[in-house]
């Protein structure tokens, strides 16, 4: 397996909490990413949404688009509705030769609400889960046919958060549903990244390697933050 190293712009600014790094320019982000030796970077809120603007900007700093976040509402939308909504980002990623799209379900998510307790995140019962697995499989097959693999991102505060959620998703969906393994989110959810890696290596196409401060993790779990 060939591994290429990229970085995400959240290291400079946070799209969910714009007050964190909101005054950091896109140019500073790209320049420092390149200086650090990365060859790729994920898209972010400050990035141009048109390829004729984004490609020259990335080229200026010798960077490639290595993926980027797409927040879906596939639980509530039909597959056709979600296909229509994804078109602008799909075109951008295809134009930029991105190897995949990081895809996460955000319907009902609490990730952007600091007043919600972690335990109140949305969850699906068996009936809804079955319908969702069918829809995400159809969506993934569509994106695969478009040459843009869907790399599902388990994420805190969403319906696919824990190791158990992630395993069920992968075991009950088409092989075209690939995986973004995020070590920080998996640790926060008290799961085992290495087990996921070993059990589903054939589905893993993208990875987020993160650290978590132990004291902050323990406080968050204890106080349900």
Language-model segment annotations:
Residues 1-100, 138, 145, 175-178:
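N-terminal pre-domain/capping segments
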Residues 10-12, 44-46, 70-75, 106-108, ...:
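Active-site beta-loop-alpha junctions enriched in small/polar residues
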Residues 50-52, 166, 190:
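Short, well-ordered alpha-helical microsegments
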